Every structure is written in structure tokens, then in C-alpha cells.
Amino acid sequence: MERASERRTASALFAGFRALGLFSNDIPHVVRFSALKRRFYVTTCVGKSFHTYDVQKLSLVAVSNSVPQDICCMAADGRLVFAAYGNVFSAFARNKEIVHTFKGHKAEIHFLQPFGDHIISVDTDGILIIWHIYSEEEYLQLTFDKSVFKISAILHPSTYLNKILLGSEQGSLQLWNVKSNKLLYTFPGWKVGVTALQQAPAVDVVAIGLMSGQVIIHNIKFNETLMKFRQDWGPITSISFRTDGHPVMAAGSPCGHIGLWDLEDKKLINQMRNAHSTAIAGLTFLHREPLLVTNGADNALRIWIFDGPTGEGRLLRFRMGHSAPLTNIRYYGQNGQQILSASQDGTLQSFSTVHEKFNKSLGHGLINKKRVKRKGLQNTMSVRLPPITKFAAEEARESDWDGIIACHQGKLSCSTWNYQKSTIGAYFLKPKELKKDDITATAVDITSCGNFAVIGLSSGTVDVYNMQSGIHRGSFGKDQAHKGSVRGVAVDGLNQLTVTTGSEGLLKFWNFKNKILIHSVSLSSSPNIMLLHRDSGILGLALDDFSISVLDIETRKIVREFSGHQGQINDMAFSPDGRWLISAAMDCSIRTWDLPSGCLIDCFLLDSAPLNVSMSPTGDFLATSHVDHLGIYLWSNISLYSVVSLRPLPADYVPSIVMLPGTCQTQDVEVSEETVEPSDELIEYDSPEQLNEQLVTLSLLPESRWKNLLNLDVIKKKNKPKEPPKVPKSAPFFIPTIPGLVPRYAAPEQNNDPQQSKVVNLGVLAQKSDFCLKLEEGLVNNKYDTALNLLKESGPSGIETELRSLSPDCGGSIEVMQSFLKMIGMMLDRKRDFELAQAYLALFLKLHLKMLPSEPVLLEEITNLSSQVEENWTHLQSLFNQSMCILNYLKSALL
């Protein structure tokens, strides 16, 4: 067991599958045009890989292979996508596979610029290297003093052959000829750091974004400033120009706002406020189309269209996830295809495990929607609800009224949500008599019928509300259900029993209809989380002492207790059949407990502590969310498609760290057989031929080999044809020929041997078979295994022929018959192949019973064998009678 636990390198039950809800980060996107397909594609960075979307439908086209570190910058040309990670960058073909890798930098790369058949890379130490793409060789290397000229932007001006323009944090710009390695000109700048460089539609004109929020339109050929614009939102993060006939420039800001400037009138024509909730990482106008692509660190990719008379962009398509870490996730529905998630950004979203086009956002909760509509507030941050801490969902009546209820951080009232309408519901559920600000909702649940919501408060009160009308339907207990804060509420599947638990360490069972206390259980420690599996009636409790207690709500007793976590337990989940309890804790571990055996069967560590776990209703995936992560991570259940050893793990088992899955489906890794050591847990168990010498053991032969041995004559009689087979009519025109290049007729065969006899030689038929020979050998050495194996390999007719040939009349002998009886005795002594011994003995007696009394040797042998058979059957009969007695008692007893 210890060797098996040492060899296990990952989870035995779960394998990383993919990540959901990740679309963008703070790395600027890259837009490419495919001349073959005549389409635009946008590439966004997601951690250690990047996504490629079709702009037309914003559908995911490809996900790249992962790189060892997080991607720090990207670039693309017409054929390849370049991504830098650390001090290395790679070229990807077909948006997926790495075809070239460039190594030479000693510091982190933060700029990449395609340059024909070359690629320019710049690191944080001021080293600029020009590479030949296909040979992966260095063409030129330039070194810049960071204190004098620290590169902050790079651009290849249009029509400027072999020239690049570099911007610096000190404010100056330099124009270099990279072929001759010469500095052509130094622009003094505007004494403010350069943050962005963008080629204008006009030749020789470049837009320069500054730290001060200014955008300078500058002619680099004549070193002349054409116009200046200024934004009050901080440094310019990115710049883009429309090329569809409208002289408009867009500039991004760290506030998430976008300014639209008219280059003819030299004025601001529009503002796109709150285009993103974080800084604009990148914005790009598609060539000759009124479409603007933006992305930001808020995990959103948006496409805006400018088709209105005011010139303001409206949102056309988007892919959006959570912009802040998640607070709660739960599978929604019974098909296991939707996952509801709440985040610290205040949104409630639904992610599809099938395709991203089925994702939808239920939006932010607003305190007063009518006030917002009446006053037309643009900035709704002041009226938004706090983040959702816990929620419960039920789809039974989702088409009739709201089916989701959520409690918010620091709020007394609980909000309802409608999944079908994808919006917040009509009611805020809270007791009317409570007006204290320090009381908050701490636990929620919805009945399986979808009609009632149960809400627990920090004051110890537990209330019931009608989901259709929002009316208060009663409270549990006289004044309050618990003396401390309510930590969990749950209702069984038939609305008969309500279970609540409080911080004072009590677990209470209530009648759901009349709200009367039925039973109370004192816990060893204060509970932290409570979870009910309605189908099995099993209740899981995570306590503050890092242990887990499992109760049966029918008997109201603790049936299992688990310990092993070294940190606070954040969440739990039951498998659909109720056999497994999966727990996630702050010790970065996810443990799987087997409830029938009461053992830990799986455990693995993660590099980030898991906050939530949820098991799919179909049992195929486990969904997790983690600290400081924006995505939902899916783990496939290995036991559904392969054999998994569920042996209990030892108490000193040390789990290994497992990497979080990426955004693409995990591919199988080919490993050479030499490096794979067989694990004890993966070795298939070979059952011995006999578990114990005292146990009667049957053979593994099918019944057709021995069950019908006594009825062979009846079977042959039934299978005998009623009429002899008809001889086909002769066909004289078919004359036999000899094959060859020239066919010749075959001459009839002539029998020229006058000595050939037509009398059958009975001596040939009387030859002894291998079975008889092995029986004769067994009479000498007392070994019958070979003879028994010959019988096992024969069919029913062959067995009858062999046993019939044992008699002296058919070529056998008395000694051979005696040896056969000894073989049967050996089988009964060893208690192996028990049914074969009975069948072979019965057939032997049927064939030779008449001659046994006349032979003293055989009579003595059969007498001993008879007592042996009777002894075995007497023992078996007593066991059969005992088993039948117990079964009859269980059938008739009133338990």
C-alpha cells in the first residue's frame, strides 16, 4: 500500500479537462486577416495559452497549446502568431502548434514586432534583437541604456523600408534603419513618456500616446506635429484609426473609457464610457469596416459597431466572463450542461459546458430598478447590490416564476433571479419587522418543488417565503431558531423535514409544515457548511475543527466522521448516487470520501486553494473555482470510462500537486513504456484457482460442456435426420480438367493394386487414445492433471467417446477404468472442478454400471468413491439448509 501511494502522482478519480469563463486578460489582442477565408480573426491571451475567435460570429476557432509560463506579449503576421513567455518567445502555426522557438534574451520580453521574414523582440533590460523567423537565427542585436532610453513602444512605419520607430519612457523617439544598424533620427518628444504608437491611414503620419493623456498626431518625415488631443482619464493605453471613410480616431484609457476623436474637425465627437470595467488593454478598428474590437483585464472581449448617426459605437457581439474571483458555483438543471456562478464583481452568470454560445449573464443586481429607469442613471455603481455570497437554484418552476434566490454580502434582504429571462427577479425577501443594519442573510435554500425559499439570518432566525408571491410564510421556532448565526438550511425532497444548523453548535430538525422542532443534535464543533443529498437523505456537515460529519436525516444520527483536512473547509459536494462526498479546503486539497466504506479514496493538491466544488448531476464532471482565479475548472470523472482502483488511502498519504486544466480539452500524453512503472493500484487482480482448500470450487467451463452429458443419446436422436440426404443428379457435361496453361482432361483413376482388401481393420479402431494413455501413466505416478485437462478441452460427444472406450470391449482395460475412478476421487479430495467430477462420474456409471459388480477392483474403488461423494454432499446440504433457513426468516420476519 505504501509503494502504491508513493507511485501515485495525481488524482486517481479526476483528470483536468478544461477551463470555462476565460476570454481575455491585460495583454492586448491581435487582429489578423485570412486571405484564404476572407475573414478577420482576433486572438486574445488567456494565461499560458491564447484563443482565436472568428470576428464574424465571435465563435472560438482554436485554442493554442500551453506554454510553460504566462504569456507576457503577443504579435502576429499573415502566417504565424508570436507569443512571448519569460525570456523566450515562440511562433505558432494554425493558431495552435509551436513551430519555432527563439531563445537569446536574459530578461523578460515585453514587445514583439513582426518585420517581414524577421521578428523584433525587446526585453526589459533594453536589449533589442532581430531574428530570422524560419532559421531562428539572430540577425541584429541593439542595446539601449534604460536610464537614457527605455523602450516603451515599437512601430514599423508604413512604406518605411527596413526602419522601425521606438518610443521611450523618457519621452524621446528614435528612428532606426535595422539593415544598416544606424540611428537615422531622434525625436525630442514632449517630455512625457510614450505609451502607444500607431500608424495613421496617411503615410508618414503616426499617432503617439503619452502618459499625460495626450495623443499627438505627428508627421515623422518632416518632424511636424499636425494636431494634439487630450483625455482626462489618464495615460493612453492604445490607439486605432477608422479606415472605412470616416476620419475617426479611438483612444483607450486605464478607466475603461474610450474617446472618439474627429480628425477633420479636431474635436471629441463621442465618449464610450465604461466600455470595460478595467483598463482598455487593446482596441483595433477592422480594416475598411465600422467595427471596433476591444479587450481588457476584466475578462471581456467586445466588438462595437458604428452604424448610428451620432457616431457612437453600440455593442454588437461579446464574450464575457467574471472580472473578479468567484464566490459560489453550482450546477443548474439535471442535464449537467449549465453552471451558475457568482462573483465578487456582483454578477450572476451561467456558463455552458457544451459551447460558449450558450453562455449568458444574468447581470448585476440593482437595489431599485425603477429609480434607475426613472432617473436614467448612467453609472449604476451606487445602486448595485453587493456581491452574492450564497445562492440556491431550482428549475422545477423556472417557466412560471423566479427559481434562484441569493443572499448578498452585508445585506439583510435576499434577491430572486429568473434564469429564463436572465434578469433579477421582482422580489427582495426579508422580514418586515427587522430593521437592524447589523443583521445579514447567511444561508438560503429552495424546496425541490420550487415554491418556497428558506432563509437563515445572522440573528438566528429562519424564515420561509413563497417564491411566486414573495409573501412571508412563517418562521421556525418561537422567537428564533438558533441562538447564534445560522450556518446552513436544507429541506428534504418531500417538503416534510427542514434541517438547520447554527454557530452555537446545534443541528435542529423541524417539521416544514407546522414549523415545530422535532429533534436537536449537539455537534462537537461549530458547523461551517451544511449540504443535503435529497435522494439519499444524507446530510454532510463541515465543522470548524476541519472535520466532516455525515448524518442520516431519517435516524438523525451521525453515521460517518472524516478528518484529514489541515485548513478551513470551503465547500462540499455529493456525487449523484450519494456514494462520494467531495470536500475542498484552504489547505489546497480536494478530498473524496467513500461513504459506504467510510474511507478516503482520493486526494490531490492544487497550487491555488479551491473555494467551491460542484458535481455534475450526471456524474461526468467536477467543477471547481479557486482563489484569485476568474475561471471555472472542469475535472472529468475517470471512473466513468476506465477501471479505477478505489482502495483506501493510508493515514500518512502525501498527495501531489496537480496543475489546473487549460482552456482547451486535455490531450493524452504519449509516454514510453520504459518510463512507466506498474502501479499496485493499476495491476488487475488475478483470482486464484481456489481460494481455500476447504472450499468447494467450480470450474469456469460453460454449462454446455458438462450439463447435457447424460442426455446425449436423446439429443442425437432428436438431431437425426428423418430422411437420408438426396444425391444430386449427375452432371455429365462437367468433365474434370487439369489446370495449366493448356487445360487437359483428367483421366479416370484406376486401382491397379490387386492385393487391396475391402475388409475393415478393427485393430486400427482399437488404438488407445491419449486420454487412456494418460490414465495408465496416472495409475503409476498418481498424477491426473494432464488427463483431466484433456477431458476439459473435449466437447460432450468427445467426452462420451473417451469414457465409452475405457471398457475392455472397446480397447480399454480394467486398470484404465480403475485409474479413471481414482482421478474422480482426486477431484473430490481437492474439491476443485466439483461439477465436472459429478458429471463425469454420472456418465461413467451410465455407460459401465453393469460390469462394475463383476470386477472386485472396480467394486472396491466405487465403494470408496461413494462414501466420499456422500460425505461431500452431506456437508453441502447442511450449508444449503442453513442458508435457506436464513432467507426464509428474512422473507417472513417483520423488521
UniProtKB/Swiss-Prot annotation:
Question: According to the UniProt entry, which residues carry Phosphoserine?
Answer: 382, 399
Q: What is the effect of changing residue 160 to P?
A: In GLC1G; uncertain significance; requires 2 nucleotide substitutions
Per the UniProt entry, what are the Gene Ontology biological process annotations, in alphabetical order? ribosomal small subunit biogenesis; rRNA processing; visual perception
Each WD repeat occupies one of these ranges, namely 30-63, 72-101, 110-143, 152-186, 193-230, 237-272, 277-320, 327-361, 389-428, 441-475, 486-522, 527-562, 564-605, 607-645
Report the Gene3D superfamilies cross-referenced here.
Answer: YVTN repeat-like/Quinoprotein amine dehydrogenase (2.130.10.10)
Q: Where in the cell does this protein reside? A: Nucleus, Nucleolus
* Listed Pfam families: Beta-prop_WDR36-Utp21_1st, Beta-prop_WDR36-Utp21_2nd, Utp21
State the UniProt keywords alphabetically. Disease variant, Glaucoma, Nucleus, Phosphoprotein, Repeat, Ribosome biogenesis, rRNA processing, Sensory transduction, Vision, WD repeat
Q: What is the effect of changing residue 347 to A?
A: In GLC1G; uncertain significance
Quote the tissue specificity entry: Expressed in heart, placenta, liver, skeletal muscle, kidney and pancreas. In ocular tissues, strong expression in iris, sclera, ciliary muscle, ciliary body, retina and optic nerve.
The yes or no answer to whether the keyword Flavoprotein is present is no
Q: What cellular component GO annotations does this protein have?
A: nucleoplasm; Pwp2p-containing subcomplex of 90S preribosome; small-subunit processome
Q: Which GO terms describe its molecular function?
A: RNA binding
Q: Which SUPFAM superfamilies match?
A: WD40 repeat-like
**Functional summary from the UniProt entry:** Part of the small subunit (SSU) processome, first precursor of the small eukaryotic ribosomal subunit. During the assembly of the SSU processome in the nucleolus, many ribosome biogenesis factors, an RNA chaperone and ribosomal proteins associate with the nascent pre-rRNA and work in concert to generate RNA folding, modifications, rearrangements and cleavage as well as targeted degradation of pre-ribosomal RNA by the RNA exosome. Involved in the nucleolar processing of SSU 18S rRNA. Involved in T-cell activation and highly coregulated with IL2.
* Disease per UniProt entry: Glaucoma 1, open angle, G: A form of primary open angle glaucoma (POAG). POAG is characterized by a specific pattern of optic nerve and visual field defects. The angle of the anterior chamber of the eye is open, and usually the intraocular pressure is increased. However, glaucoma can occur at any intraocular pressure. The disease is generally asymptomatic until the late stages, by which time significant and irreversible optic nerve damage has already taken place.
Entry domain remark: The WD repeats are grouped into two tandem seven-bladed beta-propeller regions.
- PANTHER family the record matches: WD REPEAT-CONTAINING PROTEIN 36
Q: Note on file?
A: Depletion of WDR36 mRNA in cultured cells causes apoptotic cell death and consistently associates with a reduced 21S rRNA and delay of 18S rRNA maturation.
Assembly and partners are described as: Part of the small subunit (SSU) processome, composed of more than 70 proteins and the RNA chaperone small nucleolar RNA (snoRNA) U3.
Protein name as annotated: WD repeat-containing protein 36
The record lists the organism as: Homo sapiens (Human)
* Gene name tied to this protein: WDR36
